[in-house]
């Protein structure tokens, strides 16, 4: 896995680089002429801040990358990582689907041949304030939750489009993973509400796609233990106790037997990477990364006066735990009723938010919408191999797995992830038979 130290160095280079050359129609001060150590590329990059609350000094940091080819005609895709509190720049941009990966020593950059900017312009935002180098001058703003996070993102997008007016009319896709299962549906919901009230500018939202999303906490939690059991990681006894004694919808009702079983499950799975159960855990690497991170200076500290160091996932936030229990299915229902396509995709090696719960919740949502099955559950293909399994309801709701992928789908299976994303963005169904001409560049 890409080391956190390498990611940090890449991000520090990104926002400390000198801003040069004016880009017509785009903000001169945010244009990145070149990242030291990067390969030669033909696309432009922008990075900087957007104030979402000028009075209290609350600003969100973004990184925008143009598409490799024909960026003037390509759509715009927003990507948000989850957590809550993890960096979309450090995670999404420089670990998963952005144009560059740090080299092994963290001193340079190499091209990501499966970057999603082959298909779309990409926008990564560190949200909420307190994540990465997004900040507020008022410390109480770090006591936050879903509502304030989504409202800030709406303000961010409106003001970001003022920086990039040529992109206002572009097709917009909202994507992310994990706790973005809360961010993206609620953001799409408030955007559609904004559109209904606005007599002027309207967001041109064409679809949302979320990987291994937290949609309904009690169901996702329970599914994790079913996943452990189905993969031989916990005993029959532990699984049955959790099934019969644990009330994940109301943690206060959990019995002692439930708590003991959960502890036993934690012991049994202690030496497994829950986010990718096939990867070995490398303890020296983890410790070394943490030590290096703690010695890093805050990015752009002289400008933002951040009193803390950058980390992949923020320890500054006091994020509302109650918000994690909000059911996202009603938001998804409203989005779909607005004729906006929704894709839910799952890496099948993730035990944190496993495919079992996502698949079941998508089916229940389809039933609530009275949708018929428009694609029966079956394999989809990429490069003559099974890329995963997929089903579709009512031509608007899709559930797809990505074979061999995990919690961070684009990192674990970049080629299959790009093929899936390109299909989603272009309104194409995933192929249900091998195709010798299948390409990741479509």
UniProtKB/Swiss-Prot annotation:
It is found in: Secreted. SUPFAM superfamilies: alpha/beta-Hydrolases. The gene is SCPL43. Belongs to the peptidase S10 family. Expression not detected. This is Serine carboxypeptidase-like 43. One of its GO terms (biological process) is proteolysis. The keyword Signal applies. It is an enzyme of class 3 (hydrolase). Probable carboxypeptidase. Its EC number is 3.4.16.-. Keywords: Carboxypeptidase, Disulfide bond, Glycoprotein, Hydrolase, Protease, Secreted, Signal. The active site is at 178, 350, 407. Residues 1-23 form the signal peptide. InterPro entries: AB_hydrolase_fold (IPR029058), Peptidase_S10 (IPR001563), Ser_caboxypep_ser_AS (IPR018202). The keyword Hydrolase applies. Glycans are attached at residues 137, 253, 302, 318. One of its GO terms (molecular function) is serine-type carboxypeptidase activity. Disulfide bonds join 86-313, 246-258. One of its GO terms (cellular component) is extracellular region.
């Amino acid at each position: 896995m890409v080391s956190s130290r390498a990611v940090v160095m890449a991000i520090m280079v990104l926002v400390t680089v000198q801003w040069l050359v004016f880009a017509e129609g785009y903000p001169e001060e945010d244009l990145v002429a070149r990242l030291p150590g990067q390969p030669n590329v033909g696309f432009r990059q922008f990075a900087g801040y957007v104030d979402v609350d000028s009075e209290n000094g609350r600003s969100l940091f973004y990184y925008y990358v143009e598409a490799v080819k024909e960026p003037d005609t390509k759509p715009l895709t927003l990507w948000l990582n989850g957590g809550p509190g993890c960096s979309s720049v450090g995670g999404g941009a420089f670990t998963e689907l952005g144009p560059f990966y740090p080299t092994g020593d963290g001193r340079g950059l190499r091209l990501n041949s499966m970057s999603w900017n082959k298909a779309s312009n990409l926008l990564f935002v560190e949200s909420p304030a307190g994540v990465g180098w997004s900040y507020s001058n008022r410390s109480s703003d770090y006591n936050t939750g879903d509502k304030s996070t989504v409202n800030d993102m709406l303000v961010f997008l409106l003001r970001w489009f003022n920086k990039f007016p040529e992109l206002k009319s572009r097709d917009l896709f909202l994507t992310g993973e994990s706790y973005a299962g809360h961010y993206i549906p609620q953001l799409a919901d408030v955007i559609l509400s904004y559109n209904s009230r606005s007599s002027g500018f309207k967001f041109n939202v064409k679809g949302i796609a979320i990987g291994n999303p937290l949609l309904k906490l009690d169901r996702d939690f329970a599914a994790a233990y079913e996943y452990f059991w189905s993969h031989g990681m916990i005993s029959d006894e532990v699984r049955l106790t959790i099934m019969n004694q644990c009330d994940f919808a109301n943690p206060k009702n959990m019995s002692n037997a439930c708590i003991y079983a959960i502890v036993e499950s934690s012991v049994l799975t202690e030496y497994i990477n829950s986010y990718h159960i096939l990867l070995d855990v490398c303890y020296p690497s983890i410790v070394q990364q943490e030590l290096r991170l703690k010695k890093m200076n805050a990015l752009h500290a002289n400008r933002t006066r951040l009193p803390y160091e950058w980390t992949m996932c923020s320890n500054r936030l006091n994020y509302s735990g109650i918000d994690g229990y909000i059911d996202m299915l009603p938001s998804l229902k409203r989005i779909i009723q607005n004729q906006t396509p929704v894709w839910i995709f799952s890496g099948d090696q993730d035990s944190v938010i496993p495919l079992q719960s996502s698949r079941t919740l998508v089916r229940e949502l389809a039933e609530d919408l009275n949708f018929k099955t428009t694609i029966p559950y079956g394999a989809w293909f990429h490069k003559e191999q099974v890329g995963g399994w997929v089903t579709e309801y009512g031509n608007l709701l899709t559930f797809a797995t990505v074979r061999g992928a995990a919690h961070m789908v684009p990192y674990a299976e970049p080629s299959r992830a790009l093929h899936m994303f390109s299909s989603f963005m272009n309104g194409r169904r995933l192929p249900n038979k091998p195709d010798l001409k299948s390409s990741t560049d479509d």
